[in-house]
Amino acid sequence: MRTTPSVSLKSVALPTEHGGWGFTLEPLLLALLLSPGPHTLGLFLLGLFGFLARHPLKLAYQDLRRGKRYPRTELALRVGGIYLGFALLGLLLTALTAKGPFLYPLALAFPLGAYMAYMDAQNRSRDLFPEIAAALFMAAFAPAGVLAGGSWANA
């Protein structure tokens, strides 16, 4: 009888790097602190689940690029899809409740995030420039939260 090896959900669902958590959570928590409300809760979900989706989608991409489908590939696609769904719900929540132009900082930082995603797919995310790009991309969530709260109009 042949059995398929089990795959740990934790190894697929949670990224292993420690610094990424700080770069992700600090601007998101700052946005919640500076402009609490559903608009920043949505940005929190977008940023957090976008960060979480990166790891399983990278695993799935690497497997599929090699032309292989392992048990972890299917799990990674499912988990990544769920994370992306929550991220999109966060974006929708922010879009429906924002009182200001929250997309400006995110749009300006988008090329940095795209560069980081590209380098991550090439297994070069730990190089200096991708690390800096990722930190700057995530930092854009703090001003996005303030703008979403309409605080820009009160200045």
Language model regions located:
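Hydrophobic, aromatic-rich alpha-helical transmembrane segments
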Residues: 16-20, 36-40, 44, 72-77, ...
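Intramembrane alpha-helical segments
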Residues: 88-93, 99-101, 105-145
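Helix-coil boundary and interhelical linker segments in multi-pass alpha-helical membrane proteins
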Residues: 29-44, 91-104, 140-155
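C-terminal ends of transmembrane helices
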Residues: 4-7, 54-68, 112-127
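Alpha-helical transmembrane segments and their cytosolic membrane-interface
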Residues: 40-103
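Short, Lys/Arg-rich, polar N-terminal cytosolic tail immediately upstream
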Residues: 1-13
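Small-residue-rich segments of transmembrane alpha-helices in multi-pass membrane proteins
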Residues: 27, 71-86, 132-147
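The first (N-terminal) embedded transmembrane alpha-helix
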Residues: 10-35, 134-141
